[in-house]
């Protein structure tokens, strides 16, 4: 599940970044996550010199990143708030910067997942909206182990939710699970 338009991809697969001083204690972990992409894809990360367009990795109040390169250009935020500085979350947010959207937002997700909407915390429903086919590019089969797939308890109000189907420590969006099983989220 990736950005629809080529203009949202970083030129030559090179993502320019800057890490704010407030994240210095996590810099090695951030760089390790970047290396994970570089080792398994054609994506390269390069520290900002004076470029106008770059990913500004900063301390924020939540975990979020823009999906792909901004049409407008300039700095774009990648926020690592409280609880967002583990390897899997950093890998996930970098995935958004690369151009990947959530696996559970794919247009064909209902063939693979059951979303229990009644278990979604109030105000978090937008995290489970399917993307319109006109706004996304579906890549490969559904990946149950994708770093871009939320765990079964994400935004859940129910502690009895189904277990997560993968380990966020080692998975990348490029590891494809060919399973035909249907998983349940929330």
Swiss-Prot record:
Subcellular location: Secreted
UniProt cofactor(s): Zn(2+)
CDD domains (UniProt xref): ZnMc_astacin_like
Glycosylation: residue positions: 122
Keyword Coiled coil: no
InterPro entries: Astacin-like_dom, MetalloPept_cat_dom_sf, Peptidase_M12A, Peptidase_Metallo
Keywords for this protein: Disulfide bond, Glycoprotein, Hydrolase, Metal-binding, Metalloprotease, Protease, Secreted, Toxin, Zinc
One GO cellular component, as annotated: extracellular region
Gene3D superfamilies per the UniProt record, alphabetical: Collagenase (Catalytic Domain) (3.40.390.10)
The protein's name in its UniProt record: Astacin-like metalloprotease toxin 5
Species of the source: Loxosceles gaucho
């Amino acid at each position: 599940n990736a950005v629809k338009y080529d203009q949202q991809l970083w030129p030559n697969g090179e993502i320019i970044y800057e890490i704010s001083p407030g994240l210095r204690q996590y810099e090695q972990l951030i760089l390790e996550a970047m290396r994970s992409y570089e080792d398994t894809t054609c994506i390269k990360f390069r520290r900002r010199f004076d470029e106008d367009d770059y990913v500004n990795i900063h301390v924020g109040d939540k975990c979020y990143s823009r999906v792909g390169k901004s049409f407008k250009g300039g700095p774009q935020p990648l926020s690592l708030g409280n609880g967002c500085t583990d390897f899997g979350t950093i890998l996930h947010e970098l995935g958004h910067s690369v151009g990947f959207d959530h696996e559970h937002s794919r247009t064909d997700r209902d063939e693979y997942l059951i979303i229990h909407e009644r278990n979604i915390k109030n105000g978090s429903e937008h995290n489970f909206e399917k993307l319109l086919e006109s706004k996304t590019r579906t890549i490969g089969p559904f990946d149950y182990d994708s770093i871009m797939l939320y765990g079964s308890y994400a935004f859940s109000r129910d502690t009895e939710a189904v277990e997560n189907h993968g380990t966020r420590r080692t998975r990348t969006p490029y590891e494809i699970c060919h399973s035909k099983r249907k998983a349940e989220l929330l």
